[in-house]
Every structure is written in C-alpha cells, then in structure tokens.
Amino acid sequence: MKRILKTAGTSNFKEESYYEYLNLDTLESFKELSNVKKVNLVEAMTGENGAERVKKYSVPMAAGLAYNYAAKQVDDDVLEGLKKLAKEAQLTEKYAALYNGEMINTGEKRLVLYQLTRGQLGDTVTADGVDKRAFYVEQQQKIADFANKVHAGEITNAAGEKFTTVVQIGIGGSDLGPRAMYLALENWAKKNDKFKMEARFISNVDPDDAAAVLNSIDVAHSIFVLVSKSGTTLETLTNESFVKDALKNAGLDASKHMIAVTSETSPLAKSDDYLAAFFMDDYIGGRYSSTSAVGGAVLSLAFGPEVFAEFLEGAAEEDKLAKNEDVMQNPAMLDALIGVYERNILGYPSTAVLPYSQALSRFPAHLQQLDMESNGKSVNRFGDPVNYVTGPVIFGEPGTNGQHSFYQLLHQGTDIVPLQFIGYRNNQMGTDVVIQDSTSQ
C-alpha cells in the first residue's frame, strides 16, 4: 500500500514536505536488486583483483577513519542497485527532514534532535519556544562549569575533600553508550594526561550490580550521576535507593554526593536531593543520548570537558558526511544499505561486530542497542504489518577473544555471518606488536 506522509516543521513555520513511505518490498529498486547476480566473494578477493578491490572499495570517514567494504558481498552492479534504492526511498531528503526539525517520530509526535547535541546541520530548530541547539549547548556549558569546579576542588564532599570517582546510575541508553565511550577513552586519557576521575556504572536492578560497584569504591569520595529522563524509571530509582542507603550507612549526606540528568519537567529537576541537575528532553532517544547531557556529565567528570567537546566535534564531522547525496561518498548510508542487502536480499540473519581493540569491548553492545532497538519492528510507521525482516541480530566481542570462542562457527559453521572488523594502526598505550603489517591482530 502506498502512503504519503505530510510533515510540517513545528514552530519553524517551514513549508510542508511530502515523503513517500513505502514498504521495502514494494520498491521497484528493491525488486531489481533481488535480480542482480550474487557476488562470489572468494573469487572477487583473490589475486590482483582482490588487491585492487581493497583499494577501490574504501571511502574516507571523519577524523582520519576509513570504511572499507571490499570484503562485503557486493560489486559495482550491486552498488548501482543500492544507489537506486537510496534514491527511490528518498533517504537523503528524509535525513534532511530529521536535522531540519520536521516531525520524524510520528508515533509519539516528536522531533528527533540528537544530532543537534553535536552541531547544527541545517535550519535553526525551535520547539516549545526554545532554540534547541542553543539549549543543548547551554547544558553542555553548565556541565563543563560543574566538572571544572569538581576538578579544581571548588565542589567537594562534606569534609572538603576532592571527589575521585564518578558513578553513573542508568539503564539502557543511559548506560550502554556512556559506558562504551568511557572504556574507549580511559587508557588513552591516562596515557595523554587527560584522566581526571575513575568512572563506574550501575544499571542492572539485580542488587549484586550496585553492591559490586559500591564495594570497589570509596563512597566518601564519589559523586553519583542519576540519569532518568522522566524521573520515574523504576530500575534507575531502585538503584538510586540502594546507593542512598549505602551513603547513609557510611554517615554521609546523599544530597552532597548526587547530581541528576533528567528533563526539566521531571520530579528530579528541582529536588533538593541533588547537588545539581542537567537537562535533556524528549527529542533525544536514550540510545542516541551519549552526546547529550547523559554522556556529557560522566565523561566530562572522568576526562574533562575539553575531551567531551572533542568527542562531539568528531561526531559532528561524521554527521556532515551523512548529508552527502553521493552514496559512494557517504559511509554511514553506504554501510546501512549494504546491511539491508545482506539481510533482505542475501538472507543473512545476523551481523558480528569485531573490534580488534580491548578499549572497544562494550562498543558492540552499544551498536546492538542502536540497531536492534531501532529496527526491531513488525509494523510500518502506519501500523500495518510488514512481510519482510526489519534487521539483523547484532553481536560481537573484541578480537582476539572472539577468535577462541565463537569464530569457530563463523569460519566452519553452516550459516554465513557478515562481519564488521574494526582495526587500528596503533594502540592507545604505544605497546604494539606488528604481525603481517597490522597492529590489530
């Protein structure tokens, strides 16, 4: 069934835009793609042709990264089909609608503004009478000021002693993303004299999780970040209660050890139970919140506001690349389209994300949520059932650990599992061992 969605730009008074939202299996380009000859990857990657393919099938990303898809089961004919699919599906136009502040989340009637936490890609976006980019920057600055005061010893515990540890209390997106980013940067920060405070994370409502963290830290010198957009998240408030009891049992005033990241309308916003409150809003989904105050508070305390600002700059540069109408120069869109091809044409049910870096040990779990929580649907945006699969199962572990566990199935099992390798030229600690011209062994 063909549907056309009319969307207006809320309080920006934009002209109305019209987009066709068609089920994937009804698109002519998708049907054509189904008939394109499948690639024999072994032949394609063998000999001189393989070496040339590795050079050809690579596209630059932001901050010196590169996306190489030579080992993906595509060729020029498949790529041409994917370009047609992107055009027919109006992907570039719909992405522009997102960052220009049109109502993309029609189910909840909300804008989708996570990209504004790291930069302004298009028009000024005003919602609820507020310039949202200015709002997010204001919160980032407030977090930076707070973190700097903590690091300088201007904000201390009751004994006038500096805080040395920060503990984030959250669940889902308020845990997975910030935790992955902290672990990714921890050793780099220590190596480069950027490290300020140890960070720990509590998310599981199983009290063993909180107990293990609390037993590993000095609570008298710890500051706790409670993250709940609504201020009513059961799991998070349960863990907060556990932490407050621990602080009380240690003879400490919990309100002198806790800050909140929440919405301006939540019961936490003006509570005396917190040293400070920093705000997010309903326009940022939890799984995309690492670049908002959700990630900003814990990462700024752990590494300093300057490091968090650099993180935002890198994300903003990648966002800009995602605007490119040329699919072959748009690594984010290209990878997504190849993923659709692998799942919906080739029929591969899962994708493994394999970072050859211990620092990215929790990055696959973060990507797992980003992809599977976003695409885990059985109906389209109009509530009609879909007759095709909507996404793969995402899983992964760092190499080389995975090589000695589930890689056996990847190499010799009967299922074909697409792989996403993440490798680096150098590690964070300067202790590389070069094997076969790569330090990511």
What does each model-found stretch correspond to?
Residues 9-159, 437-440:
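Extended, charge-enriched "interface" segments that sit outside catalytic cores
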Residues 26-29, 53, 74-82, 94, ...:
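General structural feature for long, well-ordered alpha-helical segments within catalytic domains
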Residues 36, 60, 70-72, 77, ...:
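Surface-exposed loop/turn and secondary-structure junction residues enriched for glycine/proline
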Residues 117-129, 133-165, 173, 177, ...:
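Non-catalytic regulatory/linker segments of enzymes
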Residues 145-153, 159-325:
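Glycine-rich phosphate-binding loops that contact phosphosugars or nucleotide phosphates
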Residues 246-437:
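Active-site phosphate/pyrophosphate-binding segments
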